[in-house]
Amino acid sequence: MLQKTVAVNAQEITFNEFKKEVLNDYKIAKISRECSLLGRREVLTGKAKFGIFGDGKEVPQLAMAKAFKKGDFRSGYYRDQTFMMAIGELTAQQFFAGLYAHTDIKEDPMSAGRQMGGHFATHSLHENGSWKDLTKQYNSSSDISPTAGQMPRLLGLAQASKIYRNEKSVQHKTKFSDKGNEVAWGTIGNASTSEGLFFETINAAGVLQVPMVMSVWDDEYGISVHAKYQTTKESISEILKGFQRDNLHKGYEIFVINGWDYVQLMDVYQKAAKIAREQHVPVLIHVKELTQPQGHSTSGSHERYKDKDRLQWEKNHDCITKMREWILDFELETETGDILRFVDGEEDLIIIEKEAKKVVTNAKRNAWNAYLNEIKSELLAVTEILEGIAKKSVNGTFINKYKNDLVNITEPTKKDVLSIARKCLWYLRDEYFSEKIELQNFIKATLKDAHYKYSTHLTSETDLSSLEILEKKPTYAQDKNMVDARIIMRDNFDAILSKHQDVVIFGEDAGFIGDVNQGLEGLQEKYGNIRISDTGIREATIIGQGIGLAMRGLRPIAEIQYLDYLLYALQIMSDDLATLRYRTFGKQKAPLIIRTRGHRLEGIWHAGSPMGGIINNLRGIHVLVPRNMTKAAGFYNTLLAGDDPALVIECLNGYRLKEELPTNLGDFKTPIGIVETVKEGKDITVVSYGSTLRLVQDAAKDLAQVGIDVEIIDAQSLLPFDVTHDCVKSVAKTNKLLVVDEDVPGGASAYILQEILENQNGYQYLDSKPATLTSKAHRPAYGTDGDYFSKPSIEDIFEKVYDIMHEFNPQKFKSLY
């Protein structure tokens, strides 16, 4: 039989192969759609908590999947289920396991039940935390819900390819790149393009010229809000026309395509991939005329805000409906006059549709049974224990009632089982028999298992953890070599760049002038403008660059010029970087080091120390607060030996202070989570960190003149804090505690106080009320006097310590006022 060929995906294939591909695509689209439809019903009937699905976006995702190659990365959002199915990284059963929040990583490989369904990820790590070969698999960075939150990371994922292609020192890292030929694929909804993160990323990608293909799924709405309220001209491609490259300017290649046009979508995505992959030019694909057959999510119906005409238009332009029409209408005449068709008639498609529905129905049932069977086995175990208890307990009537309540729950949760078990234990507080011990053991085992399933992997738990890196002290020459402290930073970074060829450092003014405090002086000239580079004023995407680069095997150090500017990036640090390892159950990591400088210097905008907000928003990131540049340099060396993300806050007023230059630069290490007693004393423990610690040291000298012997502890690390509980050992000796910092009241000092008094049980050793000394609640005022009256001074520290000693021994320490 003569077979004709058809040009598809830039290669010649036979018609039968083309036919098979088209019909398989249609089946994937239908499976995805059925998952959305049935998923909504599962939520509305109470089996799942919430659903947000990709219906109405299926066909363009099929096209994207065909252009997506192994080694590529996706950074998208919660509409991309069809794409994940098309590349073979999501099955229908896994889709429902995620919907039910099944905590088995084998059942829900996206997050082990930690994220709501629709948040997709692939596994970048082996069980021991080491990297897989990312060039041999399809890669999806883990999704987050905040709209446009995927954008900054996308920039870094794309930039990694550019670095791997152009920087010879990293081209040996073949697990992460094949000569920089990988494309980073982004997806976003049309309404979310209104977010600042979108525009910041689009601009940065155009400047950097990175291989990024950005798809905008446009259904004209953002929940209930129409595009006319979202986007100027109601079209993101229209307002981004200025980014279109031309003969004189680098920029973007921009495509506009209807989301229901299967043939044109296939063509456009192949072209886009070729441009990005070969030329390293960013591409924007504006996919229009998409729909939302079920509205935004399970929380409401789009019939509340769309009129009948719009609903009918969406029904007519549903991308699967249009694909179905195209399949039925398709005819190709051969040279001999034969007519080739995909199907003989509608019956062929009905068979596919029934198969798709069957696949999804079975997948849903299997996923639900797998989820429920685990819980039912726990329920059975508790029921048997409670039956035995009811026979012996004086409160047997109450125990039986709880047992019967549990048995009568047709679809129990783990919460149901454990809640009743714990309540029954309350009735047994004065009774003792073997069944009570069984119940206690069950509760303990369940809580331990719950900790593993719900509360692990906040930071690295492997041998690669930064907490496993031991201290290595700096060594010094026999003759002291006192230098400006910034020289220690510069020379240590020089040693780092020489030792670690995968380290790249970037930020505002970090490149040509070597940062505003000269800690990178001359290093761009020595190592090139790829490894040491300037960026625009765009803090969120500086962090995004770092996240993406770190996820692709590089060791980025991203500089935020001042701690005050960190607020621009705090959202992406909190929502994306801090949660990455947790939300993937330890299957992805981004060991990004964020360098900044802060604490006291000058005025409202350059003297901030908002540590309370930072530590409470960044659980999952180490927060390190070295008191000098030697300690800071040691932290960088430690972090590069581990695989955790971290924020290092250098002392802004410390670069010109004199420190002794170590001889083992790049090698000495400051331990993370370990405090340092910088002065021993017997009367009171004072804990501080950063720039303020120097004031505490000065105040301690004055206090010694009046007979008060202060023990000074440098916290060094706020997250984690004092893992060896050395602070409480000091409090047990002095019986008094003062925490001093320059955050606002109730900030990091309150956190430290809780750590020592509550977590370390330091309360039991106190003879005096524990105290904090902080800055005022307002931002620090400008000028020398503004600083003096805004932040703790030497005199403030002296008098606070003296007041505590006066309260303890008023006869010896007379009142000052």
Language model: regions and residue ranges:
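Cofactor-/ligand-binding subdomain signature composed of acidic, glycine-rich
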Residues: 1-49, 70, 78, 458-470, ...
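Cofactor-binding active-site loop characterized by glycine-rich and histidine/acidic residues
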Residues: 6, 34-215, 220-222, 226-244, ...
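Thiamine diphosphate
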Residues: 58, 62, 139-420, 652-817, ...
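Acidic, glycine-rich active-site loops and adjacent beta-strand->loop/helix elements
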Residues: 78-83, 188-194, 216-222, 258-263, ...
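Helix-enriched interaction subdomains in cytosolic or periplasmic regions
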Residues: 132-141, 149, 437-474, 619-623, ...
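Non-catalytic terminal/interface segments that mediate subunit docking, oligomerization
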Residues: 397-545, 550-552, 564
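Active-site phosphate/pyrophosphate-binding segments
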Residues: 588, 598-602, 606, 611, ...
